Amino acid sequence: MASQGTKRSYEQMETDGERQNATEIRASVGRMIGGIGRFYIQMCTELKLNDYEGRLIQNSLTIERMVLSAFDERRNKYLEEHPSAGKDPKKTGGPIYKRVDGKWVRELVLYDKEEIRRIWRQANNGDDATAGLTHIMIWHSNLNDTTYQRTRALVRTGMDPRMCSLMQGSTLPRRSGAAGAAVKGVGTMVLELIRMIKRGINDRNFWRGENGRKTRIAYERMCNILKGKFQTAAQKAMMDQVRESRNPGNAEIEDLTFLARSALILRGSVAHKSCLPACVYGPAVASGYDFEKEGYSLVGVDPFKLLQTSQVYSLIRPNENPAHKSQLVWMACNSAAFEDLRVSSFIRGTRVLPRGKLSTRGVQIASNENMDAIVSSTLELRSRYWAIRTRSGGNTNQQRASAGQISTQPTFSVQRNLPFDKTTIMAAFTGNTEGRTSDMRAEIIRMMESARPEEVSFQGRGVFELSDERATNPIVPSFDMSNEGSYFFGDNAEEYDN
């Protein structure tokens, strides 16, 4: 069912395409990007933003959220049926920041959702352009992955908070389609499934009746998506068992938690896409660049080239470090929240620090924050090299995972070892052999035990000079093998709260 994901490239998922050749894919992804850019230009005109204000990432986020909210059919229907005081279900808006007399001021804007939908469709040749909406969702998800640690969500479902490298895409809305499913980490899928099973345990009617039938179909579909991410037969077999369970309960939760842990070493295949804020696409379109004609790919050199020439600004709070804010956004743009810091640093050409060492909070500014002391600065989003994004998880002959975060989920297809603290990971498996699946469990544990942290993944793969667009001369970096690099290592990042 969902394993079609493996048959179609991300770009096809991203553009709802049937099988297309590379040129058609590049054109349809380009069309999607161009549509986002045209929409953004039009919104900047509507809001009377000058060029600098239009390149402010906080304004971009507000405009992006407005269009996502305008197209959120289920929520819109819900809001109309359950009117809440002071909220107009037909309107959407948010904070827009402008320079007034040398100071940044916050202005709350409100628009008819219908009007936003009209502007979006007009920018996308009359289409709803769902692919473009999903692209924006994935950019927001990548930014969340880089900014917040999902410890609380993990602990609530009985998982280890150190498993955060499995949590890519954990804030993606359910409606994000195949492209969204492709970028979700193993932990994210496990979390969604456990939440579902817990509801079934607490609510007798959850699996019953007409609604229950739909619930069951959704459950099996999510199981298949997760199964498609695993790369070993034993993990896939355990997923079949979870999916076929007559009445999913605690045994399934145990199996899923076991599988999530196993993914720290036997990593799943999780797609990585470079999704940029709308304020990058807008100015590019405005300068006359034709994305559809030139073609575009989310996993190749194109996003790197675009970021090399883009000017993006950000508001900075009084005690924040602009360089650290830049790193946060750079990681989000490159979908590198769970990549090894050694690799990210090499590609970026400047040292990438773990989250706990960054003096910066999230990009968005809360409505109750005082604007008086807030300044703006240029985000440094350029890179020294570029590398191909991977979907493989980087397992050598079926295994691999690093410490603190206790694992990584590689973003770039670049040769390195993927160090992991085996004792920490294996400790989680001792003595837990009850459950019906001990043969599969034994097989999975055996594969994990034979994994060696020093083995090299992505053999022979390297980074490329930005001028080397055809990827002809790979530069294979050499890393200090002993030094592992996890972003959330020993961390104090804020929690993500919806």
From Swiss-Prot:
Motif Unconventional nuclear localization signal per UniProt: ranges = 1-18
Post-translational note: Late in virus-infected cells, may be cleaved from a 56-kDa protein to a 53-kDa protein by a cellular caspase. This cleavage might be a marker for the onset of apoptosis in infected cells or have a specific function in virus host interaction.
Alphabetized UniProt keyword annotations: Capsid protein, Helical capsid protein, Host nucleus, Host-virus interaction, Ribonucleoprotein, RNA-binding, Viral nucleoprotein, Viral penetration into host nucleus, Virion, Virus entry into host cell
Name the residues that span the membrane: none
Q: Where in the cell is it found?
A: Virion; Host nucleus
Q: Kindly indicate whether the keyword Ubl conjugation belongs to this entry.
A: no
For the biological process aspect of GO, one term held by this record is: viral penetration into host nucleus
Biased amino acid composition, Basic and acidic residues:
8-21
One GO molecular-function entry: RNA binding
- Please list where the region (Disordered) is annotated: 1-21
Q: From the record, which residues define motif Bipartite nuclear localization signal?
A: 198-216
* UniProt GO cellular component terms: helical viral capsid; host cell; host cell nucleus; ribonucleoprotein complex; viral nucleocapsid
Any Pfam family from its record, for instance, is Flu_NP
Q: Which domain of life is it from?
A: Viruses
The annotated subunit structure for this chain is: Homomultimerizes to form the nucleocapsid. May bind host exportin-1/XPO1. Binds to viral genomic RNA. Protein-RNA contacts are mediated by a combination of electrostatic interactions between positively charged residues and the phosphate backbone and planar interactions between aromatic side chains and bases.
Protein family according to the UniProt entry: Belongs to the influenza viruses nucleoprotein family.
* Function description: Encapsidates the negative strand viral RNA, protecting it from nucleases. The encapsidated genomic RNA is termed the ribonucleoprotein (RNP) and serves as template for transcription and replication. The RNP needs to be localized in the host nucleus to start an infectious cycle, but is too large to diffuse through the nuclear pore complex. NP comprises at least 2 nuclear localization signals that are responsible for the active RNP import into the nucleus through cellular importin alpha/beta pathway.
Name of this protein: Nucleoprotein
Q: Supply the source organism's classification.
A: Viruses, Riboviria, Orthornavirae, Negarnaviricota, Polyploviricotina
